[in-house]
Amino acid sequence: GSCIESGKSCTHSRSMKNGLCCPKSRCNCRQIQHRHDYLGKRKYSCRCS
């Protein structure tokens, strides 16, 4: 699952509560760089607010 805020897709991350995706209204997406992302894609982490 993923949540969306401002049109950005967020992947699961340890910053999520209970490892679940936050409701869209509470999803805060932040772009993060993954040095070891072999796909070279931008990753987004999701944090509950």
Swiss-Prot record:
The presence of a 'disulfide through disulfide knot' structurally defines this protein as a knottin. Potent and selective blocker of N-type voltage-gated calcium channels (Cav2.2/CACNA1B). Also blocks vertebrate Cav2.1/CACNA1A (P/Q-type) and Cav1.2/CACNA1C (L-type) channels at very high concentration (2 micromolar). This is Omega-segestritoxin-Sf1a. Expressed by the venom gland. Disulfide bonds join C3-C22, C10-C27, C21-C48, C29-C46. One of its GO terms (cellular component) is extracellular region. It comes from the Eukaryota. Negative results: this toxin does not inhibit sodium and potassium channels. The keyword rRNA-binding does not apply. Transmembrane segments: none annotated. The lineage of its organism: Eukaryota, Metazoa, Ecdysozoa, Arthropoda, Chelicerata.
